[in-house]
From Swiss-Prot:
Keyword Ribonucleoprotein: yes
Compositional bias (Low complexity): 111-122
Gene that this polypeptide is encoded by: rpsP
Alphabetical list of InterPro entries matching this protein: Ribosomal_bS16, Ribosomal_bS16_CS, Ribosomal_bS16_dom_sf
UniProt GO molecular function: structural constituent of ribosome
Source organism of this protein record: Xanthobacter autotrophicus (strain ATCC BAA-1158 / Py2)
Descriptive protein name: Small ribosomal subunit protein bS16
Amino acid sequence: MSLKIRLARGGAKKRPYYRIVIADARSPRDGRFIEKIGTFNPLLAKDAENRVVLDADKAKAWLEKGAQPTDRVARFLDAAGLMKRDAKNNPKKGEPGEKAKERAKERAEKAAAGSTEDAAAE
């Protein structure tokens, strides 16, 4: 049985509220869970103390038992100091694509050709 520490959505339409739960990985997102270890209310301000409420002792115990946190829960656990989350780094994502590089190169060539013509005319 693979255990996950994940979010189970509750609340009304357009008013999300999440429980941080321990659940079998095969169970539905909002379905049966083993234990509730906290809550997350995304509607509160980011600096509000009630935005993420987490029982650190229970979370630590489940991590020691082998439960795997999802990405979002891993952020919460990292903020609480319970586990270290590696920073994601994708430097290629910020680079322009092939076509954009070609267009930029063409613009630079046109600008260079235009400035040499202006200098020759003077």
